[in-house]
Amino acid sequence: MSEAQPAKEGLAPKADPAWQHLPGVVAAQRRTLILLSAAQVLGGIGFGAGLSVGILLATQVTRSEGWAGVARTSTTVVAALVAVPLAVLAARFGRRVSLGLAWALATTGSVALVAAAELAGSNRVLASTLLIFGLGISGTGSAASLQSRYAATDLAAPEHRSRQLSLIVWATTVGTVLGPNLGAPGEALADSIGLAPMAGPFVIATAMQALATVVILLLRPDPLLLAGTYTQVDPHAPKSGTRAAMGRAWRIGGARFALVAMCAAHTVMVGVMTMTPVHMDHHGASITVVGLTISIHVLGMFAFSPLVGIAADRYGRLPLIAAGGGTLLAATLVAGLAGASMGWVTAGLFLLGVGWSLVLVPASTLLTESVSAADRTRVQGGSDAAMNVSAAIGAAGSGPLLGLIGFGGLNALSAAIVLAAVPLLLSARRLRPAARPT
């Protein structure tokens, strides 16, 4: 079946009797969404433990907050490095192999962190090596989580793409909420089996990520391979790698804007979020208040994503991305002017999470729709790599900027990053993609 002609770029596509409506495909998509959601919940719990308990373990092993931060950054770096290879693997062998391998590698990372916790008091060199390896390879779990949202669109009907992608984003909520709170139950588990207290959360993480791997291995039929049997690709089209595919995507207005929008939103979100606890601590906020603020921020990021997906399918991708940009601007204004008011800081962080979601869901869908079927998987991997690089830049740059220009200045600079994407939004509304895949 050939690819459909595009509607006006960025608007919600109209329903048509495409192959995605065939009963067998609908059943396969339903199964795919269930399995992807289950893997997101299970794997997310393990990855969430690394986000919070991991930095504590890193501080314990390295005995230096600076080196602990470097070790923690390895997770983001590896997530960026493996995004493209995982996408290439998916294009050749399907999502089942790609995502299954990623979660399996993340499982080995958690095992290494258990060993690092056990050796922290007796062999610091080996413990540090295992720590960096474990935190780094855990980044494959982050990459798998991001690429799972694209897997949800492989068999999705055009008019349902955003809402089905958003379900996978929403499933991440469970892991990001439960994972960071594994400290107490993890210590209790470690005590019961004779391990170091810090090893306990990673025993739980190992089990959860191993289960996520098993769930992904049940992904039959593979959604990407099944989609390939219906999507006609020009046999004379030149075979090319990710760089060429990204180059072609960059020449398409919608794809270019979607990529820039996701990277800008991710940079702003990570940069402001990373320094918010430091700002709150400077103004005397308790650890409980800081934790509550971050939890509310995470709630804004993920909890409303199904509503965002429904709205993007109904009203179009570009209007929702524009709304997300406006929400991010409001977030930087509220947080930047909050000063010592922890209530306003929390409100700003909540808006920051909502704005990120309003950009990520429709922009991911727009990127998928704007490129050809032949390039789609590689472009998706390239976009995830770019997002993780953006996260690393946001996290690394926010600390020095906080010291130089303060929290208000950091938010003002973040607002400028959002505004820089406006010209691309205007141009994307005038341009049409080369072809919108069905």
Where are these regions (language model features)?
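C-terminal ends and interior cores of transmembrane alpha-helices
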Residues: A104-R124, T327-A340
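Hydrophobic core of transmembrane alpha-helices in multi-pass small-molecule transporters
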Residues: V41, R124-A143, W344-L358
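Cytoplasmic helix-loop-helix junction between adjacent transmembrane helices
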Residues: G134-A171
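Juxtamembrane intracellular "pre-TM" segments in multi-pass secondary transporters
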Residues: E3, E9-R30, P221-L259
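Helix-loop-helix hairpin linking two adjacent transmembrane segments in secondary transporters
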Residues: V125, P158, L167-L218
